[in-house]
Amino acid sequence: LPIHTSTQMTITNVEGARLLKEQGVERVVTAREMSLEEIQRIHDEVGVELESFIHGALCYCYSGQCLFSSIIGGRSGNRGRCAQPCRLSYEVMDEKKHPVKTGKKERDLYILSPKDLCTVSMIPELIENGVDSFKIEGRMKQPEYAAGVVSVYRKYIDYYINACLRTDEVTAKKDFKVTKEDIQHLYDFGNRSGFTDGYYKRHNGREMITLDKPSHTKGNEALWEEIKEQYVRSEKKEKINGILRLKKDCPAKLEVALNDIRTSVDGDVVQAALKQPLAEEKVAASIKKTGNTPYEFAELDIDM
């Protein structure tokens, strides 16, 4: 089983990644707090597979290492049970514990609440700097959110890779653009007072913090309903190929294949029709009724 390490191991440098590779790790999920240059350095000097977060919630502390939730409520962030106290409002005080005037009421100041990460416009740079796998944060999110966000990123990853194949990386990167409509879709799927590109291009930044509204808001209910119809309510079925053999005085036999997996089943002995013989089209229509199973026929041959 390939070993992948979590972002909660807080791997932020070459030395940490190299140690894990020596221990047999095949893929490192980098800390969210890393820059593009730091990721590039691990890629160049260690040669381990790298997976990085590209969208979703950011942690105020190093990912998963915050003890705030554990201390005040016994819910460990490093076990995926963070109560997110960073989303509450706090008063700012100076070293003498005097309130600092911020122009906002205490209850309206969210100084520990980061905005959500969004890097769809950085896809060429992320690939160029050595990210092998993109990770979208989706803990406790609705299926519509996951489906919608993934569909936007999938669109532009494929767009960029296909452009590289048609031309070259320099031209593809130069021509890469994300439409305002798709950016708005990402906002509608959910955001916290807008988006940030996190630490990829800067160490820290005031614009990373929500300050005003820490809640995860969504918009455009029509878009959510469209995503629900397209991805959530409609069950995706695997395409299978089959052949039905119907020979007189022999058991009926159905052979089915899904990629490299093959199986077959025998039925009753086929007998000659007393009156109206079965038409091939009618037999095929009956066999293709797969009901509530997760399969549907791509091809079905009838040998009779």
Report residues per predicted region.
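N-terminal active-site wall of soluble small-molecule enzyme domains
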Residues: 1-19
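Surface-exposed amphipathic alpha-helical tracts and adjacent flexible/coil segments at the periphery
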Residues: 2, 18-304
